[in-house]
């Protein structure tokens, strides 16, 4: 079962990465520039994938400085040397700024040190400066070799043998300031740190009715400031790419006082450290504080987050991203020829792609140039689709126009939560309500799912009613698993009574089934002939039509955090294996991705049937592992992966078979996976996807205006989801064919392609399908 079969032409040969296919190669891995959480996950993936394909992998300590100094700074890595680093922030191989490498003499020394170990493949994890340096090194390589030969430091054979240097980059930077990739390694973790601080500050600010000015990192890039402002519903944000208009001081003070007048007890202003005005003059946090104090007299505090943002444990997203990129980097090095340019492994949507390194660097420099020349619209455009989308969404949600400036549509749009609670649902409701009001609709909230709908628990909901909802976990509207099927008459009556013109459903598989039932009931009940759209929100991530659902990232972080703690407990005890049961129904997403993020030895899932022989081989594998220095094991099991191989059965089997070698413990994570404050990813995903759903509803209602049109076509009842690189609306009627209704999962799931990754990184042999990687793409500037 492969989610990407469609990409390989029918009848084409699938391409697999074979074990030991890189024998004889030597790869050097280094981290350079400012550190970022997740760099260790990338180093681990490069080392283990390199060893798996039979290459020698060398650590280059302290970045380019270590390459120039040589000696013990370049050391061969083995499997165990990258154990227990997945959950550690920063970089275990060190990073340093290096002046020597900027000179030709320095690069000559570096080339000599690499040649002594036969290293002609470099994997560089760092920012644009580090990657530019690597590219220059690659260009000069043949000249450096000739110079070394002239100096008698190497012989002519070596010049022939090591004629080419291959370079692959991964972007490790918390600022997300590199063009060509949606997310850089470390950005998501930095957002976690910022949001933890904002959530903590909110409670104290509310107690004292204070205004807080938070300064976040980003000298030349406002990504962290923008996304954290979106994730916490900040009152105002200052970015280098989009400076405030002339007279912003007065506008900001008006906005803050309006919010106070609406009984909001706190104001949050987020400032990127590189914030500027339209004349390129810096806007500092102190300047903003003075302004608020003198103009409004509010009790105002400044908090500068500083290096806290670089620290702490990497988030699940960063671990998975870095692991995928590390593996892709090794494949890119194996496939590199003298003609391929240095490339960067990056993320586009949900897809790992390779881009020419210098194209990305050039575009990144173009952004800075545009800002220097005060071409701010160009700067936003060059930052890419994701940045521009975030900025647009923030503006729509933060600033409410006066009522007399909003054209009224006389349409009522209802929002409902269905299924089990998922973190991020409230962010989605807030976004829908505010976008709907800004579009001129009257917004209605339906409480307690379809059950509440049938009973008429429906109330109008206003702009300020949803203030502060973004960071709240669970479902404030209330949610139930009840399907509408048995209440169709009552729901139709409520639709008529409240004259509901469109419906937005936020929920999991029950929401999807409910949408199908409402669709089927259109013939009988004309009340259901209105635009309906569903936004997937469930920890299980099992809704057809979308690669991701709201809540899954928060659950994944909960699982990963718990696994980290459990691994620590196992390390202290020595020779202990933990069996952990995750949620997800029949969908193995949480078990599989949790396994990848936590560094598990195995993950049992329903989608990949297993038998007693597989369990036996896992036990043998763990028995071998206990002979090494890593004397602990971690096994994840999806709650419904097998009727008979239950968590208890697997625990008992492992306990018996491991007697005398290791002991075993089990842990069922349960409902803690549904709770907690939403992660930054879920807050923003919920906010953005829900805003898109409302835009679709508005467009549909516009089509029908004045004609009292009934919506009966399939394309008026859709699921909105992310698929590969696009946000798409898919009619539920079409999704039926793609659904396994018995097990409540889509028939094809993209993440199954990452199954072999987890196995390879846990020292199993597995064939990894690389059919759709390897094409070098080009950076496309995005047009606003």
Curated annotation (Swiss-Prot):
UniProt modified residues of type Phosphoserine: 6, 12, 21, 142, 386, 783
Keywords (A to Z) from UniProt: Acetylation, Allosteric enzyme, ATP-binding, Cytoplasm, Glycolysis, Glycoprotein, Kinase, Magnesium, Metal-binding, Nucleotide-binding, Phosphoprotein, Transferase
Post-translational modification: Phosphorylation at Ser-386 promotes interaction with ATG4B. GlcNAcylation decreases enzyme activity.
Record-listed N-acetylmethionine modification sites: 1
Regions annotated as coiled coil: none
Chaperone recorded as keyword: no
Pathway field: Carbohydrate degradation; glycolysis; D-glyceraldehyde 3-phosphate and glycerone phosphate from D-glucose: step 3/4
Additional remark text: In human PFK exists as a system of 3 types of subunits, PFKM (muscle), PFKL (liver) and PFKP (platelet) isoenzymes.
Family assignment from sequence similarity: Belongs to the phosphofructokinase type A (PFKA) family. ATP-dependent PFK group I subfamily. Eukaryotic two domain clade 'E' sub-subfamily.
The protein, known as: ATP-dependent 6-phosphofructokinase, platelet type
Gene name linked to the record: PFKP
